[in-house]
Amino acid sequence: IVIDPEREYLALAAAFGGQIIQISAGTGTRVNPMDIVLEDDSASDPVKDKTNNVVSMIGALIGGIDGLDPLQKGLVDQCVSNLYTRYRNQGGGVVQPTLQDLHDELQAGGDQVSRYLADALNPYITGSMSGFNGQTNVDLSNRFTVFDVSGLSGELRTFGMMVVIDQVWNRVIRNKANGRRPWLYVDEFHR
């Protein structure tokens, strides 16, 4: 797995039959930040772990420099936890929760803070930065996968990198179950 901010590994991936996944707001590529692996054999609860990750991602996305305040964090945590609990109770499956589902869950809260958070998510649901809203539509299982993050800029950079790292972690969990060890190379890590 390669995280490539300057498009230096695309030719290598193409030459070896690798998968190139372009991560940016303007592509048709979707990598769902809310993808979850329920078959985690670690001692921790995958729903709680993933909920914590999503709360951090949402904080980076709409919380600004200071992140979410405690009330906002609590509301996002509760909504995400509700989504994943329903997903797990329905047996998991292909259709994972999405940012749209989180938006709808927040909107259903009805209180002022929930509506504020739902409104803050709007640009990432239907607006110009909606590239992360929807089901993952790329193959993340190729043994040579390059995440091309060169198109991430501004406020989406931190969020996009968090999504990619989360997908890498999902891959680690799946590979562990299959007895495979992934290799991760992050180019320009200092950025």
Predicted region positions:
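Glycine-rich phosphate-binding P-loop
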Residues: 1
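Conserved functional hotspot residues or short segments at active or partner-binding sites
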Residues: 4
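P-loop NTPase motor domains
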Residues: 7-19, 25-27, 32-191
